[in-house]
Structures are given as structure tokens and as C-alpha cells.
Amino acid sequence: MIITKQSKKISELKKGDFVTVNGKKLEIDAHYVFEDYKTTKEMLVELFDSKTDKDYQLRYFSDQLEDTLKFYELKEIVYEEAEIDKIEW
């Protein structure tokens, strides 16, 4: 995975901002704490593609972004992990 551009810290991303994953421009619907551990937080960024009406998620731990950033695509009722080649925001 290559983070090609960061217009701001990932923690500052909010509803209405855009993230481009593998060349696909996705809009942020929500960004929140999924699980709060005492030393770190597992974060979720809910994304959608308005052209295809598909839903996606970015998941990461607040203290280990580079090592833990994962991308998921909603298939039926379950999110499945998908490969990230390039990402920017």
C-alpha cells in the first residue's frame, strides 16, 4: 500500500470529504471510534461510491496507521477485505 497524498491527518477526515482508493473516488459518510482500547482506538471510516451505490470501509488503529490501514468492500451483508494499491485524501 502506498499513501500518495495526505491533505490533512486521517483523524481530521469527516463526512463529505473524499478518499481515493486504487483510483476510485469515494465520499466519506462517517468517521468514528469502533473500539476504544486503553492505549489505542480502532477507527472506522464509512465510504460510499455515489456512481455505483457501493459501500466501503477503511479501518485502522489510531497509533499505527501505516501498519494497520485496511480497506473493505460491502458484499451482500458482510464487509470483505480488499487490496489497497494506492490511497490518498
Residue spans of the language-model regions?
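Mixed-charge, low-complexity intrinsically disordered regions
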Residues: 1-89
